[in-house]
Curated annotation (Swiss-Prot):
Organism taxonomic ancestry: Bacteria, Pseudomonadati, Pseudomonadota, Alphaproteobacteria, Acetobacterales
Record protein name field: Dephospho-CoA kinase
Residue ranges constituting the DPCK domain according to the UniProt record: 3-201
Subcellular location: Cytoplasm
Function: Catalyzes the phosphorylation of the 3'-hydroxyl group of dephosphocoenzyme A to form coenzyme A.
Length: 201
């Protein structure tokens, strides 16, 4: 089974690219969705987060605003949160890969924002990076805010500043998909990759 790693900075268009793979019948592990499930009601991460960050879990529900405040500007607190989440996500990721192998899937996608930072790119046969101009990304973040998201633009810029640079991601990627261009361009790149992998298998 070929493992396709998919990553990119915030609002770079990973979800769009992942949706294109799903449309082609390729199973996708969505790390962000996994985190939301783990932090959701009765999620496995809740008791650990509540213990590490008192006041962030109320009536078995995560107060995301309180958690953001607890880690804002505190690298050691963010590291503590990551130390809780990363092992739990890893368990779910391995379960996903095991299920894909059991079904004899020819390909699967690991959609992970921190793919390179946690070293998961090394296990991938192909690494794809979704990329968009900074102006496009900030516009997407603002649109999410108008759609009911709670993250401020200042918080988003802070997160972007802490992430790996686009230049470094590009350097380590096999393929760069520029989602700021037309959707058709991304579709063609995904189709070309799948065709290449099918030809090689």
């Amino acid at each position: 089974m070929k493992i396709i790693g998919l990553t990119g900075g915030m609002a770079a268009g990973k979800s769009t690219v992942a949706a294109l793979f799903r449309r082609e019948g390729v199973p996708v592990f969505d790390a962000d969705a996994c985190v939301r499930a783990l932090q959701g009601e009765r999620g496995k991460a809740l008791p650990l987060i509540g213990q590490a960050f008192p006041g962030t879990v109320v009536a078995s529900r995560l107060d995301r605003a309180a958690l953001r405040e607890a880690v804002r500007g505190r690298p050691e607190a963010l590291q503590r949160l990551e130390a809780i989440m990363h092992p739990l996500v890893r368990v779910e990721r391995e379960r996903f890969l095991k299920q894909c192998r059991a079904r004899h899937e020819p390909f699967c996608v690991l959609d992970i924002p921190l793919l390179m930072e946690i070293g998961e790119d090394r296990r991938c046969d192909v690494v794809m990076v979704a990329e968009a101009p900074m102006g496009t990304r900030l516009a997407r973040i603002r649109q999410r805010g108008r759609s009911g998201g709670r993250m401020s633009l200042a918080d988003a810029k802070g997160l972007l500043a802490r992430q790996m640079s686009d230049h470094e991601r590009r350097r380590r990627a096999d393929i760069v998909i520029r989602t700021g261009l037309s959707r058709g361009q991304a579709v063609r790149q995904v189709h070309a990759l799948l065709h290449r992998l099918r030809e090689a298998s």
